């Protein structure tokens, strides 16, 4: 459960993400593909080379979806319902992959935000991204 302080930190840090959605998203995906190569199987039609337009475009979609979740911290289930349906019923993505991408996104935040990425921010984002992963996994049950 996100506390009021967690929500405040998430909103503050998200302001620093704005304008970098495509870069941060692409970097998180590339990190995931390198660290967890099995995740590439969900993208057989993508050019998985560094900086490809497809990775950049999908990365932007991912981070934009996270931004929509940030705007709806008190109602993540509703905010992510369509994405949950898409990933569960159409794409059939193994839910463990949401956690893997979350870890990679945390690394991207830490790299780019430097001293602003405090232990408190890390903890808040860990809770937030875990909640997002849980919501995206709801339809699998």
UniProtKB/Swiss-Prot annotation:
Sites where the protein binds heme b: 87
Tissues expressing the protein: Red blood cells.
CDD domains: Hb-alpha-like
Domain of life where this protein originates: Eukaryota
Residue ranges annotated for the Globin domain, each copy included: 1-141
GO cellular component: blood microparticle; haptoglobin-hemoglobin complex; hemoglobin complex
Statement: the UniProt record of this protein carries the keyword Metal-binding: yes
Chain sites annotated for binding O2: 58
Keyword vocabulary terms for this entry: Heme, Iron, Metal-binding, Oxygen transport, Transport
Record-linked InterPro entries: Globin (IPR000971), Globin-like_sf (IPR009050), Globin/Proto (IPR012292), Hemoglobin_a-typ (IPR002338), Hemoglobin_oxygen_transport (IPR050056)
UniProt GO MF annotations: haptoglobin binding; heme binding; metal ion binding; organic acid binding; oxygen binding; oxygen carrier activity; peroxidase activity
Coiled coil residues, start to end: none
UniProt KW Iron keyword: yes
Gene Ontology terms describing biological process: hydrogen peroxide catabolic process
Pfam short name (any one): Globin
Function text: Involved in oxygen transport from the lung to the various peripheral tissues.
PANTHER family: HEMOGLOBIN FAMILY MEMBER (PTHR11442), HEMOGLOBIN SUBUNIT ZETA (PTHR11442:SF41)
Family that this chain belongs to: Belongs to the globin family.
Assembly notes: Heterotetramer of two alpha chains and two beta chains.
Protein name per Swiss-Prot or TrEMBL: Hemoglobin subunit alpha-2
């Amino acid at each position: 459960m996100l506390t009021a302080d967690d929500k405040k930190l998430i909103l503050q840090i998200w302001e620093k993400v704005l304008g970098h959605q495509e870069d941060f998203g692409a970097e998180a995906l590339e990190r995931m593909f390198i660290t967890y190569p099995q995740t590439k199987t969900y993208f057989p039609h993508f050019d998985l080379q560094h900086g490809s337009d497809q990775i950049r475009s999908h990365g932007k979609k991912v981070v934009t979806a996270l931004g929509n979740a940030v705007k709806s911290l008190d109602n993540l289930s509703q905010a992510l319902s369509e994405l949950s349906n898409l990933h569960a019923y159409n794409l059939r993505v193994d839910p463990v992959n949401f956690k893997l991408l979350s870890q990679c996104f945390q690394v991207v935040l830490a790299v780019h935000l430097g001293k602003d990425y405090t232990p408190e921010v890390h903890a808040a984002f860990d809770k937030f991204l875990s909640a997002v992963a849980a919501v995206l996994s709801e339809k699998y049950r």
